[in-house]
A protein has these predicted regions:
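Acidic, proline/glycine-rich low-complexity IDRs
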Residues: 1-35, 63-143
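A short, Trp-centered hydrophobic/proline-enriched beta-strand micro-motif
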Residues: 40-46
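Glycine-centered tight beta-turn/hairpin loop motif at sheet-sheet or coil-to-beta transitions
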Residues: 49-51, 72
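Broad, structure-driven detector of short, well-ordered beta-strand segments within folded domains
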Residues: 51-61, 77
């Protein structure tokens, strides 16, 4: 198995009292993902090392976001290109954020992405992945 650890957040007030499980089984990983509720349990991270991991966040109303990095610099977001250009609000990592509706996938899709990454460390090729764009904006005064 490619994944070496599982981090599952569990927010109690403003404190994360989640778990870190070394050498998790697929059953432990699947259970942690299924427990995401968008309230107290908002993020699961599957790590191979400090720079390579897959994160699944959200869970409320059956909406999840999934992203992967292999170098902690470039990130791939799982997307559903059939969805409209709209914004959904999700709690991820204990905070509410605005996410493109295209980034919000269902549980089965999130589990498929996690299962492939867990087993092989690769992106599931039957799904759509999009490289995250840099969020840095330069002022014309600084150029």
């Amino acid at each position: 198995m490619f994944v070496l650890n599982l981090s599952a957040e569990n927010w109690v007030g403003n404190q994360d009292e989640g778990d870190l499980i070394e050498s998790p089984t697929w059953n432990q990983i699947e259970q942690a993902i299924r427990e995401l509720d968008g309230k107290s349990k908002t993020l699961v991270t599957l790590g191979a090392d400090d720079e390579c991991y897959l994160s699944i966040g959200g869970g409320e109303s059956g909406k999840y976001i999934v992203n992967v990095t292999f170098d902690n610099v470039r990130f791939q977001n799982l997307v559903d290109p059939s969805k409209p250009d709209a914004i959904d609000k999700l709690f991820v990592g204990g905070q509410e954020g605005n996410y493109s509706a295209k980034m919000c996938v269902n549980l089965e899709t999130a589990l498929l992405a996690a299962k492939t990454f867990t087993a092989s460390g690769k992106l599931e090729t039957s799904l759509f992945w999009e490289e995250e764009k840099a969020l840095v904006m330069l002022s014309s005064n600084n150029i």
